Amino acid sequence: VTFDVVSGERRYIGGVIAPGLEAMTDFLYQRTALLPRLSLKEPHRAVGKSTVEAMQSGAIFGYRGLIREILARIKAEQFSRKKVAVVATGGYARLVASRMPGVAVIHPHLTLEGLRIVGNLN
């Protein structure tokens, strides 16, 4: 997952790179003897009643925690008293960001649409 930070003047400030949600769950599957490959979906509760439920809980709730912490630090360091628009994009944007306060827009295909627009300019 990447976090790209853009100023109010539309200037790229920098970014953050962290492991993606699928990379996290694939790592568990590939590096442990008995944990299954996950189908990612919203957990019903934090404490799972099965291995799959426990893994889904750890993946989704843990990932939201990672995102919240990084966003909080970006806001504190770069935009201490300014309003910030957070846009979630990518394949798991809806699953992860739909239950996160502070996310202004969820647009899973924004990058592809941007590439289409740039392609049409040429």
Regions flagged by a language model, labelled:
Residues 1-12, 28, 115:
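Gly/Thr-rich phosphate-binding beta-strand-loop-beta motif of the actin/hexokinase/Hsp70
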Residues 14-18:
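A mobile, often basic/glycine-rich helix-loop segment
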Residues 24-122:
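ATP-binding/phosphotransfer module of carbohydrate and carboxylate kinases, centering on a glycine-rich
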Residues 1-2, 20-23, 94:
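Short, catalytically relevant binding-site loops at active-site mouths
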